[in-house]
Amino acid sequence: MKFKMVHENYNVKDLDASLKFYEEALGLTERRRKVSEDGNFIIVYVGNETTPFELELTWLKDHPQAYDIGEEDFDLAFHVDDYEGAHALHEKMGCICFENPSMGIYFI
């Protein structure tokens, strides 16, 4: 039996701002969208041409406040062919929240 990773889900407060961020910061664009008939939720799958893996962004009508992730620690890792260029972009965007230069990683 083989399992294949398909997507990771994040709930978002502002779907449009999230879509803009993931496209600008990581080059992820909308692949498909599901809208509930009653308008209570919207799910957008974003990705790029380097992998079939997708990020699922879920907006919930009844959750207008920011999400509190508490002490839960999670991350979605990316490899990039131009580390310095990516770092410069994310630095310009002001979205780097932690760096570990000795490991060659940073978090946005």
Regions found by a protein language model. Name each.
Residues 49-53, 62-64, 83-84:
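Short, charged/polar surface micro-motifs in flexible loops or helix N-caps
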Residues 40, 72, 103:
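Exposed loop/turn and edge beta-strand positions of beta-sandwich/beta-sheet ligand-binding modules
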Residues 14-15, 80-84:
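Helix N-cap motif at beta-to-alpha junctions
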Residues 64-70:
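Unchanged
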Residues 1-3, 33-34, 45, 84-108:
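Vicinal oxygen chelate
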Residues 2, 9-52:
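Core segments of cupin and vicinal oxygen chelate
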Residues 5-7, 71-76:
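Eukaryotic phosphotyrosine signaling hubs
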